[in-house]
């Protein structure tokens, strides 16, 4: 186990991220889900919660830049998880919506996410989790100031 300190904090965060992505890739494969990378999950989650969205709104909600979102949407569209639909009121605008294929994998994605979160916070009390979340929120605000 890594002892986290100021000198390896960013390394530790990256290591955690890589381990979680590897877990997600393994679980997606085990469930027979292909064409989705772990970094695409937030896009599908946002669309599931918010419904059909304009590309610009999806960009804002995902905190990713437009070129990244465009590439992710193209990938998800190619694999049948989302569709692009021109806005009925303004043909310049593109709406993104999940497909039936995305809806069918939702239960597996929720199960994978729940299992991962349960393991991630195993052994932490409610108070420890609250402290962790408060500290990470403060760190996130500090990063926003960079």
Model feature map: region roles:
Residues 50-54:
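Short capping segments at the starts of secondary-structure elements
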Residues 59:
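The alpha-helix within a helix-turn-helix
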Residues 23, 42-45, 104:
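Pre-recognition alpha-helix immediately N-terminal to the DNA-recognition helix
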Residues 45-49, 137:
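Short, locally clustered residues in the helix-turn-helix/winged-helix DNA-binding domain
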Residues 26, 74-137:
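Charged, amphipathic alpha-helical coiled-coil/dimerization segments
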Residues 1-3, 127-146:
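C-terminal regulatory/oligomerization modules of transcriptional regulators
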Residues 1-34:
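N-terminal leader segment of winged-helix/HTH proteins
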Residues 55-56, 67, 74, 94:
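Residues within helix-turn-helix
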């Amino acid at each position: 186990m890594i002892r986290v300190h100021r000198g390896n904090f960013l390394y530790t965060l990256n290591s955690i991220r890589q381990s979680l992505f590897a877990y997600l890739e393994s679980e997606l494969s085990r469930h027979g889900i292909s064409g989705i990378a772990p970094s695409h999950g937030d896009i599908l989650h946002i669309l599931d919660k918010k419904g059909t969205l304009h590309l610009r709104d999806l960009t804002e909600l995902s905190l990713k830049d437009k070129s990244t979102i465009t590439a992710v949407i193209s990938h998800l569209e190619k694999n049948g998880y989302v569709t692009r639909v021109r806005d009925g009121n303004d043909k310049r605008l593109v709406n993104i919506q999940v497909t039936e294929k995305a809806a069918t994998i939702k239960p597996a994605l929720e199960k994978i996410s729940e299992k991962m979160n349960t393991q991630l916070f195993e052994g932490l009390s409610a108070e420890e989790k609250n402290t962790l979340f408060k500290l990470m929120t403060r760190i996130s605000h500090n990063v926003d100031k960079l």
